[in-house]
Amino acid sequence: MSSLESPNSPPNLSFTIRSGAAASTPTKFSRSISTKEPSFSHFPYSPPRLSAPTTLSKSLHTSPLASPLHSLVPTKIPDLHSADYRCVSSVLKKDGQILSIAVSNGFVYTGSDSNAIRIWRLPEFAECGQLKTKACMVVALVVSNERVYAAYGDGKIRVWRRTSDHGSLKHIRLATIPKTGSYVRSYIAGKDKTQMKHTGPITALAINASDDILYSASLDKTVKVWRISDLKCIETIQAHPEPINAIVVADDGVLFTAADDATVKVWRRNFCGGDQPHSLTVTLPAKSSPVKSLALTQDGGVLYGGCTDGYINYWLMGWFSGQLNYGGALQGHTHAVMCLASVASYVVSGSADSTCRVWIREQDGGQHTCVAVLVGHRGPIRSITAFSGALGDDQSTEDGCTICTGSLDGVLKVWHVTCKSMIKSSSQSPARSVSEYFEL
């Protein structure tokens, strides 16, 4: 996306986007190996078409490495861990590229190049409304406590309150962040304007509902902290020396940020006050590849970071120490991992190689198995979300998940994946020694 691209991007290596009948003469596109955001907005691609389930490409990629060296050897997936999957819906609207997806309380929200956020009702996955503004390009979405937060290409965040009136879904526009009045007053008072508004495009949003906090990350290398109660900016974190691509918040309030400097940083909030309410606790290196996406398991035990080299690095939270230790890297994508999602024991990744991979995680988090490769998009997959179970009456098993993928080809796809045999439970795993939990 040109407006999300860092300035002065250097020439990059090339890669291929699938192009249907023209596969024999593929078109070349750029892949970033630098610390700059690759541009996807001008990608030519084949006209989207409805997809059918394809043959599963099987490969197992795990690593017990102590540091991110990526010396991984692909291993064939045994049939025991293969999955049944299919595309249950494929929708193309005249909105352009799909840039963001969020799911909450039976509704899916999708943002695109246009000025409309489309709302889809589950389980039938039928469109039931739109949220429109004068601004275009919805680059990030998050829904929490019946509020919808959307970041736009103009660097502002719009907020709606969701209500239900006799079964009819309604959204009431609440505010635009930063508020125009506050911005003008700060300007007149001679205050630093950068403390009010991002100076670059917003790339990600995250909510810490328990602390009444909204976070926004930007290509301007900062994370802004907004108090939800009055929608005021209360802090600007100079988080990275390079553009920030992704943020995620744990249930305990720990903030994770990922950037083009090939690191993931961990921040904690200081409730004692001071000039810096958020302090850096640790920096996690991801070799030399910019980190484009983040995902955290529901229990906060595993952190995933998708990189431009196609690897998904992951870190394990120590049971007793609380420290994050490098666990390995998942290999399979041939190009940048643009988005990640985690639900139950599933990890789902979307890539610039136009595929979505589904991984199963063992109970201890150390071993991962790729059980499905979802093929059908004609452009890079930019956004993804996943939730447990199936749509409608398709409740074949309890261990399945539903995945929504949004691509720069403008197509929104819905998939259902069912693992034939779940990974061994922790009760079947061999006992672990104390030395595995403590550094002795």
What are these regions (language model features)?
Residues 71-94, 124, 186-194:
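A short helix->beta-strand "capping" segment at the edge of beta-propeller domains
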Residues 2-57, 172, 176-189, 362-440:
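Terminal intrinsically disordered, low-complexity extensions flanking WD-repeat/beta-propeller proteins
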Residues 95-101, 136-142, 184-207, 242-249, ...:
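Canonical WD40 repeat/beta-propeller blade segments in eukaryotic WD-repeat proteins
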Residues 161-169, 268-275, 316-322, 360-366, ...:
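Short loop/turn segments immediately following beta-strands, especially the blade-tip
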Residues 88-93, 127-133, 173-179, 192-197, ...:
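Short C-terminal beta-strands that terminate individual repeats in beta-propeller domains
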Residues 117-121, 157-161, 217, 223-226, ...:
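WD40-repeat beta-propellers
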